[in-house]
């Protein structure tokens, strides 16, 4: 998958693709060249995923900034089923 295509993936699709690659690498049945290619692809996916998370964090900060410019600290409270 080309780097530009990775950038277009949603975060969930990026994570799913990364999980597939990790599973393939953990099996240990890929030839060395293919394993290296998959590893490189995984690195690109990790970087893209991190970037998407950083962008989401920035959007949240913008949304939590009050009209007077001060930031409102809102603690994260997971829903009961997510702990």
Curated annotation (Swiss-Prot):
A single GO CC term for this protein reads: exodeoxyribonuclease VII complex
A single GO BP term for this record reads: DNA catabolic process
What are the subcellular locations of this protein?
Cytoplasm
The record's annotation in SUPFAM superfamilies points to: XseB-like
Task: Report whether Protein biosynthesis shows up as a keyword of the record.
Answer: no
- Name the EC number(s): 3.1.11.6
Its recorded reaction(s) are: Exonucleolytic cleavage in either 5'- to 3'- or 3'- to 5'-direction to yield nucleoside 5'-phosphates
* Species: Aeromonas salmonicida (strain A449)
Matching Gene3D superfamilies: Exonuclease VII, small subunit (1.10.287.1040)
- Job of this protein: Bidirectionally degrades single-stranded DNA into large acid-insoluble oligonucleotides, which are then degraded further into small acid-soluble oligonucleotides.
Keyword annotations of the record: Cytoplasm, Exonuclease, Hydrolase, Nuclease
Q: What is the protein's given name?
A: Exodeoxyribonuclease 7 small subunit
The record, for Pfam families, names: Exonuc_VII_S (PF02609)
Protein family according to the UniProt entry: Belongs to the XseB family.
Q: Does the keyword DNA damage apply?
A: no
Cross-referenced NCBIfam families: PRK00977.1-1 (NF002137), PRK00977.1-4 (NF002140), xseB (TIGR01280)
């Amino acid at each position: 998958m080309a780097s530009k295509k990775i950038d277009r993936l949603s975060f969930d699709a990026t994570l799913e693709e990364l999980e597939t690659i990790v599973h393939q690498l953990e099996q240990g049945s890929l030839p060395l060249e293919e394993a290296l290619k998959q590893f490189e692809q995984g690195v690109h996916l990790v970087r893209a995923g991190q970037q998407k998370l950083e962008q989401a964090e920035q959007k949240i900060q913008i949304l939590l900034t009050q009209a007077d410019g001060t930031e409102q600290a809102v603690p994260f409270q997971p829903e009961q089923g997510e702990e």
